């Protein structure tokens, strides 16, 4: 798949911009703070209805406006698909083929993206919430039912936590009803995540072995807060975990176990990767991103769109060449950079856009 056209209206520092893209390689060139990353963020937001840079949607709206509008035309094997997002102070409206979508799971997945940015190193060193968000964003694109199950789980979780905080006297029967619903959707979420991690590890192990000159083996471990060794008895394990945590939950007035407490760990040759070098972290994250591309292709039969936010200068020659091999294949890629000096090996079929003060101008093909 590839993004043929993008229209931005009052998004970040863009007042109104319309731009047609190259089906292969697109380079956003410009000084810092001109809007290069904002352009990538717009593409990411159009795909996922979420920003990778802020949790607050209103930060995306131009400072002197009250709403924003994004639209794009995606080309796929099955034909072209118009996508639209309108964001106001009241919320967002999403459209596919000009039809309003009632649920997030009905929208996400029509345009798949893989983002590689400097902050992705936090995937190894950062908090568990960063890794959970990574799973949610990637898995949600290839398995819409996951987003539906996750949304339902979070809804029940919010209900349970609100009840724990507000009730003067806890009705154990009502709490058990909430627990049963939490277990139902929670088990679905954990099973989705377990299957995803296994597939990601399979693709990632191969990529990392190649990238490390056949000396490092990558493994990924899913670490739920519930014992998941026996998938057949996962529901029972979750119920027992909630029962054991109930006194703690009543005291702290929140839910101590469940998918919202999950984590994943990365290992290189059996050693915790978080203790590795900066170079190992870069290689590991690159391996994961390349694995994501193959995983998405294997499930959707479409290549995702690759977004590279100022990462080429961070990679050594070996890692750059490995990434460029992927770019040279049939995958649309967007790169942000302040200079073309370190991009000599780029494919010939590319478009260069100069970004300045929230405006994009084509200056090379």
Swiss-Prot record:
Gene3D superfamilies: P-loop containing nucleotide triphosphate hydrolases, RecF/RecN/SMC, N-terminal domain
Protein's GO biological process: DNA replication; DNA synthesis involved in DNA repair; double-strand break repair; SOS response
PROSITE patterns found in the cross-reference section: RECF_1, RECF_2
Major localisation: cytoplasm
Binding residues annotated for ATP, in chain numbering: 30-37
Coiled-coil parts of chain: none
Source organism superkingdom: Bacteria
Recorded GO CC terms: cytoplasm
GO MF annotations, alphabetized: ATP binding; single-stranded DNA binding
Keywords: ATP-binding, Cytoplasm, DNA damage, DNA repair, DNA replication, DNA-binding, Nucleotide-binding, SOS response
Cellular compartment(s): Cytoplasm
Pfam families recorded: SMC_N (PF02463)
Keyword Transcription regulation annotated: no
Residues annotated as transmembrane: none
Protein task: The RecF protein is involved in DNA metabolism; it is required for DNA replication and normal SOS inducibility. RecF binds preferentially to single-stranded, linear DNA. It also seems to bind ATP.
Family: Belongs to the RecF family.
Protein name, as recorded: DNA replication and repair protein RecF
Taxonomy of the source species: Bacteria, Bacillati, Bacillota, Bacilli, Lactobacillales
């Amino acid at each position: 798949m590839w993004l043929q056209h993008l229209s931005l209206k009052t998004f970040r520092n863009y007042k109104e911009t319309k731009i047609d893209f190259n089906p292969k390689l697109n380079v956003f060139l410009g000084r810092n703070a001109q809007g290069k990353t904002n352009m990538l963020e717009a593409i990411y937001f159009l795909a996922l209805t979420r920003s990778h840079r802020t949790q607050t949607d209103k930060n995306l709206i131009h400072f002197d406006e009250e709403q924003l509008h994004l639209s794009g035309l995606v080309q796929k094997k099955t034909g072209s698909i118009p996508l639209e997002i309108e964001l106001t102070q009241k919320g967002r409206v999403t459209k596919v083929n000009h039809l309003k979508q009632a649920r997030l799971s009905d929208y996400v997945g029509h345009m798949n993206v893989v983002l590689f940015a400097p902050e992705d190193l936090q995937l190894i060193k950062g908090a568990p919430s960063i890794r959970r968000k990574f799973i949610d964003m990637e898995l949600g694109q290839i398995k819409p039912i996951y987003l539906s199950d996750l949304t339902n789980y979070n809804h029940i979780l919010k209900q349970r936590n609100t009840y724990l905080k507000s009730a003067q006297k806890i009705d154990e029967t009502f709490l058990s009803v909430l627990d049963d619903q939490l277990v139902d959707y929670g088990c679905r979420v954990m099973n989705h995540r377990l299957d995803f991690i296994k597939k990601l590890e399979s693709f990632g192990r191969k990529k990392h072995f190649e990238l490390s000159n056949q000396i490092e083996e990558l493994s990924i471990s899913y670490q739920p807060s519930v014992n998941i060794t026996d998938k057949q008895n996962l529901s029972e394990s979750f119920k027992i975990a909630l029962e054991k945590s109930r006194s703690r939950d009543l005291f702290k007035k929140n839910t101590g176990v469940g998918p919202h407490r999950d984590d994943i760990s990365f290992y290189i040759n059996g050693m915790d990767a978080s203790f590795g070098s900066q170079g190992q972290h870069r290689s590991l994250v690159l391996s994961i991103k390349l694995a994501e591309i193959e995983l998405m292709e294997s499930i959707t039969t479409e290549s995702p769109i690759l977004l590279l936010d100022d990462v080429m200068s961070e990679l050594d020659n070996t890692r750059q060449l490995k990434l460029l091999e992927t770019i040279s294949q049939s995958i649309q890629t967007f790169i942000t950079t302040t200079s073309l000096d370190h991009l000599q090996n780029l494919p010939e079929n590319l478009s260069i856009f100069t970004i300045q003060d929230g405006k994009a101008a084509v200056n090379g093909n």
